[in-house]
Curated annotation (Swiss-Prot):
Assembly and interaction partners: Component of the small ribosomal subunit.
The entry's keywords: Cytoplasm, Ribonucleoprotein, Ribosomal protein
GO biological process, one term: translation
InterPro entries named among the record's database cross-references: Ribosomal_uS15 (IPR000589), Ribosomal_uS15_arc_euk (IPR023029), Ribosomal_uS15_N (IPR012606), uS15_NS1_RNA-bd_sf (IPR009068)
Task performed by this protein: Component of the small ribosomal subunit. The ribosome is a large ribonucleoprotein complex responsible for the synthesis of proteins in the cell.
Cellular-component GO terms for this entry: cytosolic small ribosomal subunit; nucleolus
Gene3D superfamilies per record: 4.10.860.130, S15/NS1, RNA-binding
Underlying gene: rps13
Record-linked Pfam families: Ribosomal_S13_N (PF08069), Ribosomal_S15 (PF00312)
Broad class of the protein's primary localization: cytoplasm
Protein's name according to its UniProt entry: Small ribosomal subunit protein uS15
């Protein structure tokens, strides 16, 4: 799938393993992996950061193959899921950083244009999450309160 506001085609992607079974050399059980997920979530890590740590440090290629559920679903079952979806959170964080840059560099027209693109992606993603009932129907992105959301 191509990029929304860039000319790139976005062809690079990670390859999923062909077999969906748990590798024989993996000694962690489903409960061990879940405990590790809860421990990392309590430290304040996002689901993708948890997945990277489990992959690199514990040898769990896909949490879904071991536990039967994705990381976010496991976190939701315990009530540890983040209140904002991760992709929306990172877009808001990027918009706050660009806005902070614009306060120091008022004449940066390109940054002003990129901020408009970032905020349009935020609005589009928020509209999607409202239809999927992940966000409250009255949730609204306001640039004045955005820095409080990501702090």
């Amino acid at each position: 799938m191509g990029r929304m506001h860039a000319p790139g085609k976005g062809l690079s992607q990670s390859a999923l393993p062909y077999r969906r079974s748990v590798p024989t050399w993996l000694k962690l059980t489903s409960d061990d992996v879940k405990e590790q997920i809860f421990k990392l979530a309590k430290k304040g890590l996002t689901p993708s950061q948890i997945g990277v740590i489990l992959r690199d440090s514990h040898g769990v290629a896909q949490v879904r193959f071991v536990t039967g559920n994705k990381i976010l679903r496991i976190l939701k079952s315990k009530g540890l899921a983040p209140d904002l979806p991760e992709d929306l959170y990172h877009l808001i964080k990027k918009a706050v950083a660009v806005r902070k840059h614009l306060e120091r560099n008022r004449k940066d027209k390109d940054a002003k244009f990129r901020l408009i693109l970032i905020e349009s992606r935020i609005h589009r993603l928020a509209r999607y999450y409202k239809t999927k009932r992940v966000l409250a129907p009255n949730w609204k992105y306001x640039s004045s309160t955005a820095s409080a959301l990501v702090a």
